[in-house]
């Protein structure tokens, strides 16, 4: 064929579809039957496509049709184009469907009870065809193994089987009651914590180190206090009562900080930060029941984050 002008934009996805069907069937007639078109219409699609590309896509004879070298190259790309069109169509169809069915959600114990459950209840009122099964755990549940549709997590490691969407910023706050600070003073440095009563959170029976951001780097600090508690809300209660210094999530102590029941300490070395994520198994299309719930939480927190400005 003659050298083409600069490549023209392909305006007809139907031409690409016709090309792929001819290539698959190695027949204009079979492709025409599959697409419910006439053989001449298929021929016009291929001619228009070849004109746009400036190459010959098929070798034709009275008995056979086969791809040219250029045709084989274009075929590889054309298959991907049609696959993406199918994906886009399916995704749009999914967005138009109302949430329905059983929804399994896994939540961190305190964050889930205080800040996620009110949003889940509102979601269920809006979508009466959804039934929710909700589990609470501060462990990182295996979502794929346990059939969980979506989990809310603070931080955590990436997993190739899962998709993570950031819902909100979050960080740890080191704090104590004004009464405690009046009696014992505030630590001026991280090392000074050793001279204070520290309230220690335990996970699976082990003390969890405190985490600080020092000159842009995370520093983990082992703490050893007389009170070791495996429940963050009970630890918060002890801090408010003046029993010592605690490091707790901003989501848990923001109200206490605003009300003056707790005061931050060691503000020059902020507690480490980790976003709150929605985490769900990697799927070709996200179901409406999961997508809408995640969108609802993200929208609510974008306008009214309960632990702002301590995030």
Locate each region found by the language model:
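C-terminal effector-binding regulatory domain of bacterial HTH transcription factors
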Residues: 1-10, 76, 129, 250-259, ...
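Hydrophobic two-helix hairpin corresponding to the core of helix-turn-helix DNA-binding domains
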Residues: 16-19, 31, 68, 242
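Short helix-boundary/capping micro-motifs
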Residues: 21-36
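Residues within the DNA-recognition helix of helix-turn-helix
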Residues: 38-41, 45-48, 119
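A short LG(V/I)-centered, amphipathic sequence patch enriched
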Residues: 50-67, 262
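Short helix-loop hinge/linker segments at domain boundaries
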Residues: 62-65, 72, 83-106, 307
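Central regulatory/effector-binding core of bacterial HTH transcription factors
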Residues: 100-163
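C-terminal regulatory
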Residues: 142-147, 157-276, 303-311
